[in-house]
UniProtKB/Swiss-Prot annotation:
Entry annotated with the keyword Signal: no
Species the sequence originates in: Lysinibacillus sphaericus
Name of the protein in its database record: Binary larvicide subunit BinB
Compartment(s) where it occurs, according to its Swiss-Prot or TrEMBL record: Spore, Perispore
Main location: other
Protein's GO biological process: sporulation resulting in formation of a cellular spore
Cystine pairings recorded for this chain: C67-C161
Chain spans, region Probable pore-forming domain: 199-448
Residue segments, region Beta-trefoil domain: 1-198
């Protein structure tokens, strides 16, 4: 136990009682109502330390073995202050990240000589020991506010009780006393925000409506290619930079200049094929949809997530703590399967029963995810084409009296997809209508 005269810099307020007042840590979307501590980098100070103390980093004590890292400390008049942002997790806890080097607080799985766990600087991995619960508290007598950090289901509390010398007090987590810590211990766990830097946060785009399937205007009009298709923004989410791999930026630059990245979800009509089919003729056409393994692996590497076989989003450890916020912002569901969406190749036989040649263009709904920096630069994008929503437009569409007919459907390859169903034939494609195939039904529905 530290008294008011020890090297921790604790003031004469020893002996006062404290009452805890939990902060409002209800999970919120990353798109809206970010708490201030998730929008700014603050230098933390102990509330009862002498003026001039602030958060810093020190070389890890040489007596600690098998843990090559730097440890966080509260240091008097330090020349290299550390500024921290707290990224809000789905469950209301926080990842505490350092503006200078992009690393995070980590409760090291070793013990100091007083049975405390040191708080070290480490690359973000998503492990439990990097998650901290922040609770607001108030001095019972003065009413002055501060906050405390807890780990391991509130069985341990962040403390600055272990002094290396008269200038430096290491941060560590101490075991919670049965009811509440003695007041002299509580002051060692009381922190306040000091000076700050603003985080770099991109603006969220407005959502928009998806246009109808494009119509060809002549026999020579081959339709709209994917690169020229009009996109509709259906959702967007702010991604903490700690979960993003940006091949052109290191962790420090990401944290300073792209504290959050923007992930946009857009939809557009992706052209599968365009062909003139002679009157009363049948043609065989291959259709390629889904997403390739190369693209999926790229998404996993850069975002730590992938598109499931049901077109929902699946998250790995680094991103899973933010998955509810991300899917809510993107307006996309969580995947109900661990199977990755793969590439689907099908062979279709179409019959033109009209008395004239007709230009047909088939489109399927594309789901596009685009990662952007704060300045709007595109880092990368990933596209999955959804074969379950498709439609055909034709020219001329009058005086055509007979629609295009799908007479045969064969799956050539269906990688990693749990939906290997084929359409029941014959299937009529009415001009401009979207065929909607669900996972539950073999018989397609027609959008009216």
């Amino acid at each position: 136990m530290c008294d008011s005269k020890d090297n921790s810099g604790v003031s004469e307020k020893c002996g006062k009682k404290f009452t805890n007042y939990p902060l409002n840590t209800t999970p919120t979307s990353l798109n809206y109502n970010l708490p201030e501590i998730s929008k700014k980098f603050y230098n933390l100070k102990n509330k009862y330390s002498r003026n001039g103390y602030g958060l810093s980093k020190t070389e890890f004590p040489s007596s600690i073995e098998n843990c090559p890292a730097k440890e966080y400390s509260i240091m008097y008049d330090n020349k290299d202050p550390r500024f921290l942002i707290r990224f809000l997790l789905d469950d209301g806890r926080y990842i505490i990240a350092d503006r200078d080097d992009g690393e995070v607080f980590d409760e090291a799985p070793i013990y100091l000589d007083n049975n405390n766990h040191p708080i070290i600087s480490r690359h973000y991995t998503g492990e439990e020991r990097q998650k901290f619960e922040q609770v607001g508290s108030g001095d019972y007598i003065t009413g002055e506010q501060f906050f405390q950090f807890y780990t391991q289901n509130k069985t341990r509390v962040l403390s600055n009780c272990r002094a290396l010398d008269s200038r430096t007090i290491l941060l560590s987590t101490a075991k919670i006393f049965p009811i509440y810590p003695p007041a002299s211990e509580t002051q060692l766990t009381a922190f306040v925000n000091s000076s700050f830097y603003a985080a770099a946060i991109p603006q969220l785009p407005q959502t928009s409506l998806l246009e109808n399937i494009p119509e060809p205007t002549s026999l020579d009009d081959s339709g709209v290619l994917p690169k020229d298709a009009v996109r509709a923004v259906k959702g967007s989410a702010l991604l903490p930079c700690i979960i993003v791999h940006d091949p052109n930026l290191n962790n420090s630059d990401k944290m300073k200049f792209n504290t959050y990245y923007l992930l946009e979800y857009k939809e557009y009509w992706h052209q599968l094929w365009s062909q003139i089919i002679p009157a009363h003729q049948t043609v065989k056409i291959q259709e390629r949809t889904g997403i390739s393994e190369v693209v999926q692996n790229s998404m996993i590497e850069d975002l730590n997530m992938y598109i499931g076989a049901d077109f929902g989003m699946h998250f790995y450890l680094r991103s899973s703590g933010f998955k509810e916020q991300i899917t809510r912002g993107l307006n996309r569901p969580l995947s109900q399967t661990t199977t990755q969406l793969g590439e689907r190749v099908e062979e279709m036989e179409y019959y033109n029963s009209n008395d004239l040649d007709v230009r047909y263009v088939k489109y399927a709904l594309a789901r596009e995810f685009t990662l952007k920096r704060v300045n709007g630069e595109i880092v990368k994008n990933w596209v999955a084409v959804d074969y379950r929503l498709a439609g055909i437009q034709s020219y001329p569409n009058a005086p055509i009296t007979n629609p295009l007919t799908l007479t045969k459907h064969t799956i050539i390859r269906c990688e990693n997809s749990y939906d290997g169903h084929i359409f029941k034939t014959p299937l009529i494609f009415k001009n401009g209508e979207v065929i909607v195939k669900t996972n539950e039904e073999l018989i397609p529905k027609i959008n009216q």
